UniProtKB/Swiss-Prot annotation:
The gene is plsX. Its EC number is 2.3.1.274. It comes from the Bacteria. SUPFAM superfamilies: Isocitrate/Isopropylmalate dehydrogenase-like. The lineage of its organism: Bacteria, Pseudomonadati, Chlamydiota, Chlamydiia, Chlamydiales. Catalyzes the reversible formation of acyl-phosphate (acyl-PO(4)) from acyl-[acyl-carrier-protein] (acyl-ACP). This enzyme utilizes acyl-ACP as fatty acyl donor, but not acyl-CoA. This is Phosphate acyltransferase. GO terms for biological process: fatty acid biosynthetic process; phospholipid biosynthetic process. It is an enzyme of class 2 (transferase). One of its GO terms (molecular function) is phosphate:acyl-[acyl carrier protein] acyltransferase activity. Pathway: Lipid metabolism; phospholipid metabolism. It catalyses: a fatty acyl-[ACP] + phosphate = an acyl phosphate + holo-[ACP]. Pfam families: FA_synthesis (PF02504).
Amino acid sequence: MNVQIGIDLMGGDHSPLVIWEVLIDVLNSTASNSHFSFTAFASHEVQEQILSSCTYKECPKIIASDSFVTMDDSPLSAIRKKSSSMALGLDYLKEDKIDAFISTGNTAALITLSRTKIPVFPTVRRPALLVRVPTMRGCAVILDVGANVSVNPEEMLGFARMGLAYRQCIGEKEHPTIGLLNIGSEERKGTEAHRQTFRILRETFQDSFLGNIESGDVFSGSVDIVVADGFTGNIFLKTAEGVFDFLRHILGDKLESDVKRQLDYTIYPGSMVCGLSKLVIKCHGKACGRSLFNGISGSIDLARARVCQRILSSLS
């Protein structure tokens, strides 16, 4: 399947040229083939700088923007920048000119702009950021990791349904199990919202719902899908990334290669904005080199798999 991937070169922690170089690396990769292409979005200045020095035989298309969304912009400020690189990229996605859109920029702005431009699944109340993390048994899917700070139990149920549909559509497990991220495994633990969510998940998914799960148990692989509100999920994810980086730093060459692979969360795509009718991927603002390479490559795979359409089909 031929796919067209859009990527915002602006707004991340690194220079747009760093992202461009990784994009070219993906094109040059022996693991890649000709069944995909890129459309990049950048400021006029960056466009001119890249095109004047691009030596790639078929330089990817670059769409020039009048502005870009910064990390300091509020969602409202981002909406007002109607010709930003992020807004143009999402417009292209909305108009089916591209099959997926990737950004390393402002998360809140990306979520807000995506929701204003891209239709949400009819059965979804709120989109969620979905990410895969390594476990002792492969990987787990966790959502939400930052799209929604405050949610109610019905919205958490929606996250569980989307996580289940995602796991099933990528074919990793026929009957995935679900856990609710909480401060303890007992049913009575957590806020009233967590206790209500526990009851709703148990009634809805029955034996597939294994109850509450503590942060440390996620990595055992005891559940396949971890449901969380965006505030808790984001803290969990950033703590996990920090611990993985810490272990690799202090142990260095003492780690066996297979252990390093198990600790390497960068092998997975960035966070998918799950619940949208089209594919939007948020890569870490600090992503560069291998982590961004894997994020882009993984996004290509998700676009080829038509993951959004398959999730919608599963939810219908």
